[in-house]
């Protein structure tokens, strides 16, 4: 009988969380080739096989092995034996075990048994490279699937890299390759640290005539609190023209739990907005609104080794909305209960996200409010809007598709929507006008219980289009068309005399990114529908400037 020898060896590449927008960060896995033996049987000669015998397996349940190999009892030639070994190899890969080799060793003629040898590669060495601000312990904590003496499971490693690469300050890849001895696997974790610019300033004209056209925000971010990859963010926003009328403060904390393939997110938000004084025959009228919110959300990364990724989320918020009105000498009494009201909300949100980097994203979220507190009754909600239900439910949808039409042109489609079966208070209604929805109109100029906005945008870099050297001085040009629609329950108007309203716009935009520190976006949109003070044919310029340092 001839000695066993490998007939071929191949390197298998597996998608992972290391996939970036450029698709350069793939997890390369030396899964091992299918090795077969050159036997004494001539090509085309079959021998009877009554059963399979597999040695070396500790990872797959016996039921999975039996299912992969099928039922024996037929004559098999060498290609059929190779196919059986390949089926078992595929079963390991399907279960996420990449560093496993199935061997077809030398067989004993006349035994009527097909012997298969499994070699489960185990990690013998773990190296890291590229990290400077992050410690080696930090990097290794983010990939607990890599443990000395254990076979790495690609399904787990894939999700760990996905979670690790949500950190804004680093990007990790893993390379698995054969070690010095048979069955050894050496792991190399390479880290690409991104520029650390903790401070960010945003300036945009997303305000209102009443509170000031401009909004100025300052943000601080720490991407590695306590060397545990916890990301802390703090943000404050106001109106530089009328700072006493707008104050928004928020804070977020994201905690990755790599072993559980889960991220926990916490958020705090406090806002206060005051309108200008309106003079009436009964005296000066002033409106003010404020909100408080605290929430937590858990995100589970679902297993999978394809290019598409998916996750589940479960969140719970505690919210308080308050509206105040004063009129003349009586103050709040002059506005009555409809002008002064408070609502407590405890919305529970369950979401599912499916996405492929640089290709598409789909998010579906179901929200159900749990009434709580002294202002969580139907009567409290009715004080804000007659007929509003404190046990409201929502179904939200967000989708995005990116496609490259040519080396120079890219097409992007976006959809954001909400469906509500009952009337909602103002704070929970959807807005479909403004810089992030339907451009060409004031922010939230059109709101409703249910609604959707969509956008189709064609973009290209001007320097590549004109065959010029790539430079930050050249902008990315975009041509877009936006549209939106809202509807209200109980006949509530979104425009005078209408409970269902539509709007649309079209325009052109330009954006610059300078040294990955300064970002400027300009959109000029022409309104196609009259909404409030915006007439059909009016043009509006949306500006956004960001500086990081």
Residue ranges: model-predicted function:
Residues 172, 197-199, 226-232, 259-266, ...:
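Repeated loop/turn-to-beta-strand initiation elements of outer-membrane beta-barrel proteins
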Residues 220, 512, 537-549:
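Outer-membrane beta-barrel "beta-signal"
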Residues 191, 222-224, 255-257, 300-302, ...:
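Residue-level signature of outer-membrane beta-barrel architecture
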Residues 176, 201-205, 216-218, 232-238, ...:
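Transmembrane beta-barrel strands of outer-membrane/channel proteins
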Residues 2-17, 43-207, 236-247, 395, ...:
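Periplasmic polypeptide-binding modules associated with outer-membrane biogenesis and secretion
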Residues 243-352:
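Transmembrane beta-barrel wall of Gram-negative outer-membrane proteins
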Residues 322-483, 487-489, 496, 533-535:
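C-terminal outer-membrane beta-barrel translocator/porin domains of Gram-negative envelope proteins
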Residues 183-185, 212-216, 245-249, 290-294, ...:
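Residues that define the transmembrane beta-barrel architecture of outer-membrane proteins
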